[in-house]
Design a protein with these regions (language model features):
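Hydrophobic alpha-helical scaffolding
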Residues: 20-24, 78-82, 153-161
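A glycine- and small-aliphatic-rich helix-loop capping segment at beta-alpha/alpha-beta transitions
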Residues: 9-21
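Short, intrinsically disordered, mixed-charge
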Residues: 2, 36, 94, 98, ...
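A conserved active-site cap/scaffold subdomain adjacent to cofactor or substrate pockets
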Residues: 23-132, 148
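Generic preference for flexible, low-structure residues
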Residues: 18, 50, 87, 108, ...
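Short, low-complexity, polar/charged sequence segments that are solvent-exposed and flexible
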Residues: 16-18, 53, 82-83, 92-93, ...
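C-terminal non-catalytic interaction/assembly regions of soluble proteins
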Residues: 127-201
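Glycine-rich phosphate-binding loop
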Residues: 1-8
Length: 202
């Protein structure tokens, strides 16, 4: 399975799509990619996060997928963060290597997607085109890691120090314990970014 399959599968079942309904499947994959990392779509992966209200308690996104694969993104009213063309674009560009987004069901052409703001915290995504899936896919293997817990947060965009501080403050606000309640605690910011990157990987 893939992250986006959690959304694509139910949409395909609900709408009765065939395995070669490439455009509809591509729309659902793009919708799944849009919400697969939760609050990254509502401001958590946005370079201009300092302009987004309520980042200390960001609302989770949702996606309404239509019969043709077009989608309306939104979030619950009264929660922090925002759903905008900027926040959705930032998430759609996350972890893609190029305009062709390969999946087990369809290859989604991210260079065909169009976004329109439909109102506060509502973005309409449409126009996405799909092609047959590739012959091969990558594989992930996981294993248990013991009794210790480690949390990593990948930060992208500008103002990395400010974003790291925001995330740390939000974590302790939500955590029922304080730093002194732990036997061992280490928080550090590891920088691997480049001042003037030439590639997406940098």
């Amino acid at each position: 399975t893939t992250d986006a399959a959690v959304v694509c599968g139910p949409a395909a079942w609900h709408h009765g799509w065939k395995r070669n309904d490439w455009d509809a499947l591509a729309g659902a994959v793009a919708a799944g990619h849009g919400i697969e990392c939760g609050t990254q779509a509502t401001g958590g992966n946005y370079s201009f996060f300092t302009e987004v209200p309520g980042m200390e308690r960001v609302g989770f996104p949702w996606a309404e997928i239509a019969q043709d694969g077009s989608t309306v993104f939104g979030k619950h009213d009264g929660t922090g963060g925002e759903v905008s063309i900027g926040t959705i674009t930032s998430q759609l560009l996350y972890e893609i290597g190029g305009p062709e987004y390969f999946g087990p069901d369809v290859t989604t052409r991210f260079d065909t997607i169009e976004l329109e703001q439909q109102g506060p915290d509502r973005v309409h995504m449409h126009g996405g085109k799909g092609e047959p899936p590739p012959e091969t896919l990558k594989v992930c293997i996981n294993r248990p890691g013991g009794f210790r817990n480690e949390m990593s947060v990948c930060l992208t965009g500008i103002d990395i120090e400010a974003k790291a501080k925001l995330i740390e403050d939000a974590f302790w606000e939500a955590c029922p314990y304080g730093p002194d309640d732990f036997e061992f605690l280490k928080i550090r910011l590891v920088r691997t970014d480049e001042p003037n990157p030439e590639t997406n990987e940098q």
